[in-house]
UniProtKB/Swiss-Prot annotation:
PANTHER family: NADH-UBIQUINONE OXIDOREDUCTASE CHAIN 6 (PTHR33269:SF17)
Gene3D superfamilies the record matches: NADH-ubiquinone/plastoquinone oxidoreductase chain 6, subunit NuoJ (1.20.120.1200)
Membrane topology: Multi-pass membrane protein
GO molecular function annotation: NADH dehydrogenase (ubiquinone) activity
Organism: Marchantia polymorpha (Common liverwort)
Homology family: Belongs to the complex I subunit 6 family.
EC number: 7.1.1.2
Reaction equation(s) it catalyzes: a ubiquinone + NADH + 5 H(+)(in) = a ubiquinol + NAD(+) + 4 H(+)(out)
Entry-linked Pfam families: Oxidored_q3
Subcellular location(s) per record: Mitochondrion membrane
Protein name, per record: NADH-ubiquinone oxidoreductase chain 6
Swiss-Prot/TrEMBL keywords: Electron transport, Membrane, Mitochondrion, NAD, Respiratory chain, Translocase, Transmembrane, Transmembrane helix, Transport, Ubiquinone
Regions that span the bilayer: 1-21, 27-47, 49-69, 87-107, 150-170
GO CC annotations on file: mitochondrial membrane
Amino acid sequence: MILFYVFVVLALVSGAMVIRAKNPVHSVLFLILVFCNTSGLLVLLGLDFFAMIFLVVYVGAIAVLFLFVVMMLHIRIEEIHENVLRYLPVGGIIGLIFLLEIFLMVDNDYIPILPTKLSATYLTYTVYAGKIHSWTNLETLGNLLYTTYFFLFLVSSLILLVALIGAIVLTMHKTTKVKRQDVFIQNAIDFQNTIKKVR
């Protein structure tokens, strides 16, 4: 239960910092932290496969895409600070409506706020998974990835590595004052014409 509350508190604080952070890059990093804490909650619930898919899809694809888009757009933070106050009333009204909807959704017979007369007889079920000795989802997936489909797994990893390096190259700021090496030009140089013996 302690880990559950730790993940919940970190997810809520990170979600608030996504909105409150002044730097857009910091907002994306806090969003990644929200996804990681949510994956921790899914692991505690026994949904290990969903936790892994959550990390792969949201953190590995969407959050990294947001990060590179923010880095490439050259967002001016000063303009964002000037326009923050004009959106506060509308944001406050939307937040209050959302909070009211949460209370209306939770306060019912199935999910009461105060469990005084909770009768969970309709929620009882029998778990047959614990009665059969079998592998977990992660063990089965790992066994298939690293034995049967290991070649495809390596190829997909190389493709992701090339895409990551390409995104970093695209977001680099090219200036005239910075000295860089051009490997293609260096390899294409004819050393017989450049190096001469001096007697």
